[in-house]
């Protein structure tokens, strides 16, 4: 599925909500299924890095509304991402897949520090690398981190796994029955129309560096594998003209 001389390298972004199954904490069945779908892609030669969110535990912006200092709330969210990283690492290793966690905040007993060249070396050896603790700084979303990490470790594509939708639509498909799914979507259209791809700062970084983003639905069985190996599912956000599915 991938050229051994030029292997496909991707970054998979998973939201904290995906890990929680819509609830606080982690849904082990969901994480196990995601792990089971990652392994076949790695076995086909795809190099897989992952950024996970922490929204199933804490969200800094929401904690701020409750009176908690925004920076402190963001750090709480970063620690939540590390719990998700360790859970996913465990399920991947249960499947026999060597996995490393690297965190932007040093915590030597549970993870390696984030070192880009070391991460690349792990990927080249067939290990999955999971990045935790966001950027290690407040006010940076895990969407922004996913673009930044993908640029630093030279990924071909960023894959955004979404719950509840199978791509990016012209309007909210849950509210508008006439909403159509984009097959391709330009960065500018996504930004101007405020379409639900990722936050604006992350999308601007992707546009400025021409980093392709594929948005796909997480809930369809097998979709994670399909996205990782390069199947054209969901919506591709790039410099190409926007086009809706027929």
Swiss-Prot record:
One cellular component (GO) term of this entry: cytoplasm
Primary subcellular site in the record, as a coarse category: cytoplasm
Binding residues for UMP: 54, 74, 135-142
Signal peptide: none
Record keywords: ATP-binding, Cytoplasm, Kinase, Nucleotide-binding, Pyrimidine biosynthesis, Transferase
Catalysis performed (reactions): UMP + ATP = UDP + ADP
GO biological process terms, semicolon-separated: 'de novo' CTP biosynthetic process; UDP biosynthetic process
Subcellular location: Cytoplasm
Identification of the protein by name: Uridylate kinase
Species assigned in the record: Bifidobacterium longum (strain NCC 2705)
